[in-house]
Curated annotation (Swiss-Prot):
It catalyses: 2 a quinone + NADH + H(+) = 2 a 1,4-benzosemiquinone + NAD(+); N,N-dimethyl-1,4-phenylenediamine + anthranilate + 2 NAD(+) = 2-(4-dimethylaminophenyl)diazenylbenzoate + 2 NADH + 2 H(+). One of its GO terms (molecular function) is oxidoreductase activity, acting on NAD(P)H as acceptor. Gene3D superfamilies: 3.40.50.360. Signal peptide: none annotated. It comes from Caldicellulosiruptor bescii (strain ATCC BAA-1888 / DSM 6725 / KCTC 15123 / Z-1320) (Anaerocellum thermophilum). This is FMN-dependent NADH:quinone oxidoreductase.
Length: 201
C-alpha cells in the first residue's frame, strides 16, 4: 500500500479554484485505480502554515531526537519523507507559487530528514518517490518569450529534485484568462490528462 500526500495551496473552494477542479478529479480517478492506497490531504491554509520565526529556525537546525517527530514544524518534514507520492495542487500566482507553499517547502526541506550533507555536497533522501504538480494559469508559459517568466512549476521541480524526487510530472491548464480562449475546452483537455496520469501514478 502506497501513501499519497495531497497538498493543496489555494484558499479558494474546490468548486471555485480551477486548479482544484483538476486536482480533485485526479484524486477521484486515482482512488478508483489504487483503492488500497492511503491518501492524506494537507490543506495548507487550514494547517496554519506560517513563515519561519527565529525560534523555528533554531529548532530546525538543532540535533534531531525522537521528540522531533512531534515538533510543530518538523512533523511536516517527517510526514513528507514518509509519503511515497505527492500531488501538489498549486496555481501560478504572479509567475510563482503561492507564498504559503513556499513556507511549507521551508518546513519540509530539512537536513537529516529530506536531504543530507555529504563530502560531495547535498544529497536528496527521497529517491524513488514521485510527484505531480497540478497548476492553472491565466496566461501561456510554454513557449518563448513567456516561458522564461515561469518560476512556479520550475521551482517546484527543482526543489523536489534537490530532495531526490526525480519522477516529476506536470498537469497545466494555461491561457485561462486570455480573451477569446475556449476555457471549457482547455479545462476538458487538462481533466483528460489528469485522468491518464492518475491511472498509472
Amino acid at each position: 500500500m502506497a501513501k499519497l500526500l495531497y497538498i493543496k495551496a489555494n484558499p479558494k473552494s474546490n468548486q471555485s479554484s480551477r486548479t482544484f477542479i483538476i486536482s480533485e478529479h485526479f484524486i477521484k480517478v486515482y482512488k478508483e485505480f489504487h483503492p488500497n492506497d492511503q491518501i492524506i490531504t494537507l490543506d495548507l491554509y487550514k494547517e496554519g502554515i506560517h513563515f519561519l520565526s527565529q525560534e523555528d529556525i533554531n529548532d530546525i537546525f538543532a540535533p534531531k531526537t525522537e521528540a522531533s517527530k512531534h515538533h510543530h514544524i518538523l512533523k511536516y518534514a517527517y510526514q513528507f519523507a514518509e509519503a511515497d507520492k505527492y500531488v501538489f495542487a498549486a496555481p501560478m500566482w504572479n509567475l510563482g507559487i503561492p507564498a504559503i507553499l513556499k513556507a511549507y517547502i521551508d518546513y519540509i526541506t530539512v537536513s537529516g530528514i529530506t536531504f543530507k550533507y555529504t563530502e560531495q555536497g547535498a544529497v536528496g533522501l527521497l529517491r524513488g518517490k514521485k510527484a505531480v504538480h497540478i497548476m492553472a494559469t491565466g496566461g501561456e508559459y510554454k513557449t518563448l518569450p513567456f516561458s522564461d517568466f515561469e518560476m512556479a512549476n520550475r521551482y517546484l521541480k527543482t526543489i523536489l529534485g534537490f530532495m531526490g524526487v526525480e519522477d516529476f510530472k506536470t498537469i497545466t491548464a494555461q491561457r485561462l484568462d486570455i480573451v477569446g480562449e475556449d476555457v471549457e475546452k482547455i479545462m476538458f483537455t487538462a481533466l483528460k490528462e489528469a485522468e491518464e496520469i492518475a491511472k498509472g501514478f
